[in-house]
Amino acid sequence: MGLVPFYPNAVQVPLLHAALAQLKRIGKIRQIIFKCRQPGISTFASGIGGWKTFFFDNVNTFVIAHDKPTVAHIFGMYDTMYDEMSPEVQPERPYYNKGSEMVLSNRSRIHVGEAKNINVGTGRTIHVAHGSEICRWQYLDP
C-alpha cells in the first residue's frame, strides 16, 4: 500500500478538535486516551508531537512504551514524518541514533525509553510526552 497522507479518521477527529480547543484555551495539549486496539492514536499523537518538535525551538519530546520494539515502532513514525518533510521546512538533523534519539538544528529533540526502567526520563525537561501501552508498564500501582 505504501505511505499515504494523514487524514484524521472518525476516532481521531474528535480528539483533534479537543486538542486544538485545549491548545487555544490553555496553551498546551494534555490528553489521556483510553482506546480500543488500532484506531491510529499513536499516529495521531506522533503527528502532534512531530509538529511541535519539528517546527518549534527547544522542544524535548519523550516517547515511552512497555518494551523496546514498541518504542522503536513509534520512533519510526517520527522518523517517517521527518524523512517525508519538504526540504524547505525540514530542520537539519545533526545527531541521529536510529530508533532512539533525534536531535534537530532547532535545538529540539526526540528521546525514547522503556517503562521497565523506573528512572526513565528523569533529569530531563519534557515538553511533549507520548506514553504508549501504559497498561503494560511494569511499575504501575493499581
Residues covered by each model-derived region:
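Phosphate/NTP-binding elements of NTP-utilizing enzymes
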Residues: 1-142
